Amino acid sequence: MSSNGSDLGHNNRRNEKGNPDSVHSSMRGSMSSTRRKSINFQNQLQLALESNECDVMYCSLSSGRFRAPNGENFPPHGGKLKLSPLEKYDDANRGVPPPSPAPNSDCFATCVANQLPSQSCSVGSAKPETSVMQKHGMAGNGMVGSGMSGNGMAANGTNYHQRGVSPNSRYRLERYRESQSTPQSKLMDNMGGMPSAVPSVSATRLLLPSNVPLPLAQCENYNAYLGSTVHTPVKRYVPTPPPAMELYSDLSISSSPAANLPTPAAAVASSASTSASAMQSQYANMPYNYRSKCCHSEASHGSLSRTSQTYASCSPACTSPSPAPSTSMSMVFSAASSCSPIMTATSSARSGNHRGDDSDSVIVVPPGGGAMAQIEAENPSGTCLHCNTVRRTTGVHQTTQTTGPISPVPISLPVPMAMPVMSGLNEQMPSQSLESSMVSVQAKRLEGGGNMAVPPGSNQHQLYRSQMASNPRLQHIHHQTQQHQSLQVLPQPQNHHLSCKKRIGMYMRRTTSQFFGVEPSTEAADCALWQGRHRRLAIRCFGMFDTELEYHMQQAIGGGNEDAGQSNGTNGNYAPDRPDILPVQDAIGMDMTMSGDSRRQKCYTNRDFLAGEFVERKASVGYMFVAMVSYLVHMFNKRRPIQMHRVRCPWQWSRSFAPIHVQSHSNQQTDADGCLTDGLEAIIDDEVFFDSPCEITTSAVNDESSDIGRQAAKPRPCADQSGVGVSVYMAERQQNGWRTSALNSGGNATSDINLTGDQSSHQPGAAHIPLCSSVSSQMQPAMRSSHSTTSTCNRGNRITAQLLDGVLENSRRPPLRCIKYFSVNDLDDRTDHRPFFTYWINTVQVVVLILSIICYGIAPIGIGSEQKTGQVLVTSLSLQTVQHVEQRNLWIGPRNIDLVHMGAKFAACMRRDIKITEVVTKTRRHERETACCIRNDDSGCVQSSQAECSIRGLYPTKSISTWKKWSPSESGPGGRISGSVCGLDPKFCDAPASIAPYEWPDDITKWPICRKTNSFTQRYRYKDHTSEHMVCEVIGHPCCTGLYGECRITTREYCDFIKGYFHEEASLCSQISCLNNVCGMFPFISVETPDQLYRLLTSLCMHAGILHLAITLIFQHLFLADLERLIGTVRTAIVYIMSGFAGNLTSAILVPHRPEVGPSASLSGVVASLIALLVWMHWKYLHKPHIALFKLLLLCSVLVGIGTLPYQLNFLGLLAGVICGCLLTMSLVPFTTFSKYGRKKKINLIWTCVLFHVVVYTAMIVTFYIHPSEFHSISFVDMFSNSNGYDNFTNADHHGVDVVSSNTRYSQTQNSQYYYHHHSDDIIRKSVTFTEKALVSHILYPTAPRKTSAQQWQEVEYSRSFNHLSNYSDRIKKSIGNISKLKQVFTSPIRFSNKNNHSNLMTELTSVHSENKQKYLGYINNNTEFNVL
C-alpha cells in the first residue's frame, strides 16, 4: 500500500511537469485509485473532454457535452462512463502479484516510438456524439487518467499500454512480496525526454463508427496479472528460436463502406483522428486470443526494458518494431490533425480451471469516407517486446502457449472488411497450446519528417491505388489475399442441419449407451465414478475393505477421478467464489484424536470433495421432518425460550474463514519441501478456537511398533500423499483447556483419526503411500492407547470451557453430543444418487394402507376364522339368526375381500377362471327354473324355486304363497314359458323395450335390467291377473357375497350383515357380474372376461396390515436406499418393479385362488442384487466377505418365512424375484460383469439379459392366459393351507339359520338356496367326491312337521347347521350315525311323480336314531329331481 501511494504521487508530479494539461486527469486518477481500494467499488471511467486538450482515444473531439448511449448527459470536464461493477474483492493497488503458469509478460508497457513529430489535435467547433458500448469492468492498477481507456498518449504521439490486473489475483494470498518501484529519472532518460502519460486501468478499446456491426462475442481468457518481479517458471516453453518464416499470411482488403470487425484470429489495431465534421464513434471489445509468435532482432530494445515493475507503477515506453520477415500494417486516416497509431496486445490465456476477467481493447476507427488506408511492408530491425519480457523473467524464449480458449468465430470464415485485416492464420486445435497474437500497427513514416495530411474530401480508393502502384510487394499481397478469399469459401465444410428425427435418434443412442455405461467417449471418467460408488456401497453394506486391496483400488479411483476432474474445466476451489473464506493450511497427514465410544473409522474418502468446492451434506428427509416437528414443539412450548436458538442445522457455518483442519485443495503443484502456503503463519499463530498441530512422541509405543511409529511420524510431502482419510468429528472435544483438541500431529499417522488426504496425483498410475496403510492394523490399537498419554499440545488455562461455549453461542456450531463428520458422509451426496424412488415408494405404500384402513376398517385380528351372529330380516319376512364367518388378519389390516377390491394379486380377476365359469354356468341353469313366489296376503314377492316357495315352515298349500310359473298352457307375453320374474316383464318395460328386432329372448337369464316401467300395472292392478308379479312388492334382490363372486337373492339387511354388494336395480343374478363387483378397480372390458393384469403391479403398493408395512419399510430403508444410492433412481425402479412383476406372475400361475399383497418379490430382488454385487464386484476386496454374504442369505430366509404367512407371496414367487433381480442388476449396473470387464462383453451381457427377460415374461404370460389349467394338479394351496389360515370354506358360509317367532317357541330349518347359489367350496375343492364334513353342508335336510310341544321338539338332536365352524363339530359327531343312514337313502336319484299335476305327495322316510329313534319326514315336491352330488 505504501509503495502504491508513493508511486502514485510520483507519477502525479511527473505528469504535472511533463504535461500540464494532464494534471487534472492525474488528480482524478489518484482519487479513483484511492476509491477502488474498497471491496464493492464500481469502476468509473471519467472522460474529461476539454476544448484545448487532446485525449488519448479522441484525437479531435471538441469541447462540449458528452452523450452516453442511454441518453444520460454529463457536464463538460466531468463526464463519466459507468462500467460493470466488479463482483469480487479488488486489491489491485496492493501490489500482490499472484502465482501463475502463464507467461510472465503481463504487466509490461507497450509503446510505439514513432518518428513522427508531435502534433496537437485540432479543435473543431462541432460537438460529436459518441456512443460507447460498455462491456466488462476494468481490473486496473495505478491511476485512472481522465479520458483514458486503454492507452496513454503523450503530446509527441507516443502511446503507452499497460495490461490490467487479473481479478483472480485478488484471492491468491500465497505470496506476499514487497513491490519495487523504478526511478522515474531513469525512465525519462531512456525515453529521451518524452513526457509520460498516465496509463489506463484497462486494455485497449476499439472505437468504431456507428454503422459498423459488432459480430464478435467477447471471449473469456485470463488477462495480464503477473508482474515481472515474480520469477515463476513458465510451463512448456521451448528454449529455441522460431523458424525463419512469415508469421502472418496475406492481407485481405475490402473497400466496402459497411465494415465488419476482423476475426478474433488476428487482432487489428488502428489509429484514428476525427475530422471537423461531427461523426460518431463506437466501442468494441477485442478479445485477447492470439499473440504474434515473433522473435526478431533484439538490437534496439536496449535500455527501454524495465527491470522491475509493480502494480502501482507506471508503464515505461518501449519500442517494438514489427518483425523482420513479416509484414506490418499502418493505417493513416485523413483528419485535420493526426494522432499516433495505437498498438494492441493480448495476453496468453491462462491454463487450468481459473477464470479471469477480460481487459477490453479500444481501437479508434474514423467514420467512413473521412479516412484513408495506407499499407506498406517494412523490414525493420528491432526486438520482440513479448519475447524480451519473457526472457527478462525466465531466461527462456516463449514459442508456444500452454492452454488457451478458441476463437468463437471460425478462423477460416471470410469476413468482409472495410480495412486491411490479418487473415490466413492456421486454425489451432482445442487440445493444442495457443499463443495470443499481438498485431503491431504503425503509421508510415512521412517523408521529410512531416505528417501526411490528406484532405478530407480525398478518395480512399485513389490513395489505395497509388500506394499499390508505388509498392510492388503490396500488389502481390493483395493478389494473394483475393485469391485466398475466393478459394476459402469453396472447400469450407457446410454445417448440415440434421432433421428432427435424426437428432432424436442420435440423442437416444447416446443416452442409452451412457445409461448402460458403454459410451466410449466417457468410459474412463464413468469407470472411476462408479468405482467410487461401489466402494462406498461396500463400506455401508458389506463391511471394511482389506488394507492392501483397498490401497490398490484407491489408486485406480484416484487416477480416474483426477483425469475426470481436470477435464471438467471448472474451478474446483471455493476461494474465488467465496471471498469471505481464506485459504487455510493444508491438513494432509494431520490427525484428529477423539475419546469415547463415538470413535468411528471408515478408511475411504471421496475425491470429488478434494477436487471440487466444499459442499456440506444435504439434509435428509427424515431430519427435515424431525426438525420441523421440533421447531413446532418449541414454538408452542414457551417454558424454555432460551434454548430456542439451539435448534439449528448442525452443519452450517458462520465463520469468515475455515478452521485449519478443513483442507483447501488447489490445482497448482505444491512445493515438495512444505505443505503450508505462504502468508498464513500469522493466521495459524493467532488461532484460538482450534488447536494447532501437536507433537507426539513415539517413545511410549511398544517395542514391536516403535519402528513403524517412527517411520509413520516422518514428514512427507503433500504432493505425494494420497492417503485414505476418515471422518472428522466436530462436536467431540476435550474440555481440559480453552482450546479444543481437534487436531494432533500434523504429519503423524499414529493418532485416532486422519483427515481426508490429498489425492491430487497427476498421473493415474502414480504410486503413493496412503495414510491408513503406513501403519499396520495390528499396531494401531497400541499406538492409539499410548497417544492419549504421550501427546502434548499447547493449551492455555485462562479461559474455561464454559466461558468459551458462551462466547461461541452465536455461531452455528453443532450442538453437544451431535457428531458432524466431513470426509465420509458429507461427501456421499457428491456423486451418489439420492434415494428418491425409495422415498416415493415408501410414501405411496403408507398412504395406500392408511386409506384402506379408513375406508374398509380393520378385520378381526389373529389367525384362523371368527364367527359373527345377528338377527336380520330375510325373504320370508321373518327375523332369522344368521351366523357369518370371517377370516382373521394377522397383520392388523383390512379383510381379504377388501384387499382384492383394492387391487391385490388375485388370478380370478386377471383372467377367466375355468372353475368359476363352471359354477356360474351351473347357477344360471338352475335360475332358468325359478319363478316369482307371490305372497297371498300381498306382503311381497321374491324370485325363488318351487321348493322354496312351497316349503316355508307350513304344509305345501296355496293358502300362504303362490309360485307363478309360465307354462305352455299359461304362457307369458309373446308365448314365453321361461318366467315369470318378480318386477320384470317385457310387456311392461319401456327401456329397453322388447320390440323387433330387439325382442327379449325366451330365457330369463338373458333379460336386461329394465330402466323404465310403464304405469299399466297400477290401472289394471285388480283386473289383470297376468300382471301380479309386477304389482307385488319385491322383497329380495341379488346380493354378491364371498371372494369368488357368489350371488344370492336376499334382502338388503341380510346383504349388509354379511358385507356384500346389494343390487336393488336388478331382479336376477344373471343380470349382474358379481366378480366385477368383487374385483373392483377398473371395470372389465368384457363383462364375462376378467382382464386386470395390472394387479401384478398394484399389489406391490399394498400391504395386509400395519405390521406388514413396518417390515417392508425397514427392508426398503436399509437395503433399497443403499442400492439406489449406487445405481440411481431409474435402475432401482426397474429392478424393484420387474422383480415384483416376475414374482407375482409366477405365484398367479401356480397359486391362482389366493389373494396376495406386498412387495415380497421386489425385496427379494433387491437382496439378490446386493448379493450379486457382493459376489462379483466386492468379494476379493472385502476383509470379511463371508459375513456379509451370511447376513444377506439370512435376510432371504426371513423373506421366505414371511411368505408362509397369510396374504403373503408364495416361496416360488420369491425365487422368481431373486433370479430376476440378480440378472437385472448385472445388466443395468455399468462396469459389472461375471468375468473381467470388457465393453463388448458388457454389451453382450446386456442383450442376453434383456432377451432372457423378454422370453421368460412372454412364456409366463402365455401360460397364464392360454393354458391356465396346466398347473392345477400341483397342490400348492394345500401345501401351506394350515399356516395361511385357508381351509375348505370362506366367509360366504353362513347357512345355519334359526327362525324365531314371538308367538310360538319353535325352531325349524330352512333349505339352502343352492339352486342358484354357488359356494366357494365348489371352486377350491379338487375332486367331485365330498368329504364327510363337506357333505353336511350340502345335504338338503327334510323339513320336520310342527310339534305340539316345544319340549318334544327340543329333544330332537340332529345337525341343523350348514356351516363348517369348529364350534359345531360336537353336533356333527353326535349325528354321524344318522348321516351314514342318510347316505344310503340319497345315493341314487329319487324321482316322485304323480299323474295329477299340482298335487303334493308325502313320503315318510324313517331312520332310527341312536337315542330316541325319532322319525324324519321329508316332503319333496313332485316333478323335482334331487341328486346327491
Curated annotation (Swiss-Prot):
GO terms for cellular component: endoplasmic reticulum; endoplasmic reticulum membrane. Keywords: Endoplasmic reticulum, Membrane, Protein transport, Transmembrane, Transmembrane helix, Transport. Residues 1-36, 560-579, 740-766 are annotated as: Disordered. The chain crosses the membrane at residues 844-864, 1100-1120, 1132-1152, 1157-1177, 1187-1207, 1211-1231, 1246-1266. SUPFAM superfamilies: Rhomboid-like. Residues 22-33 have a biased composition (Low complexity). Rhomboid protease-like protein which has no protease activity but regulates the secretion of several ligands of the epidermal growth factor receptor. Indirectly activates the epidermal growth factor receptor signaling pathway and may thereby regulate sleep, cell survival, proliferation and migration. This is Inactive rhomboid protein 1. It comes from Drosophila melanogaster (Fruit fly).
